[in-house]
Amino acid sequence: KETYLSRDFRETAAQCFPSQAKELNAFFDARLNVLLAENADASKEKQYHLKRQILPGIAAYETLQRVMPKEEALQTVHGYVEELARTSHKQLAALLRIPGLYRLVPGVFVKSTRSVFGPAAGFDSKELQVGNGIWRVDMMKCPYHDTCVAYGCPELCCCFCDSDDISYAGLHPKLIWHRTKTLGRG
């Protein structure tokens, strides 16, 4: 299934490396298939993150390094992730213009984190404070970080950490998104 990362990668290959695009796409597809096969035994919940973002990100990053320096490849993949995050931010901010809706956000975050970002998906969180419109959590384990480290590209994880910050910071004057650290950025 085509993801935003694979779509954006193919666009970069076609626009920036037209004479090599076919070869780059073939390498990307082959690498992604290997990554998917190596992670086929992961839980359904973890597969959601692996297939949608983590593994296509790794495949794009590795493939781009065939035609550009490592740092440029990292910034290119970061750009893909950032673009999606900015779109997400705009949509969420527009939704939160509905009067009073911001009050539901902490509760929604708690529920979605427990399900989509729970232990079955490879996350381990420690809730520090829940209630009275506040939700504080320490993420102790993250499959984005673990997978990037396992495949020798820990620097790629910051793309996904930054994505959260872009998506959620400044959504509403009465909501504060704040991180002190992430597993990927330290």
Placement of each model-derived feature along the sequence:
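Secondary-structure boundary/capping signal
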Residues: A21, E72, L175-I176
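Sparse, context-dependent recognition of short Cys/His-centered cofactor- or disulfide-binding micro-motifs
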Residues: E45, H49, V108-V110, A120-G122, ...
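A short catalytic or substrate-binding loop motif that flags glycine-/basic-rich loops and adjacent residues
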Residues: G118-P119, G184-G186
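Amphipathic interaction/junction segments at domain boundaries or subunit interfaces
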Residues: R52, P56, E62-Y151
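N-terminal, charged low-complexity regulatory/assembly segments
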Residues: K1-L64
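Short, hydrophobic/π-rich interface segment
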Residues: E127-G184
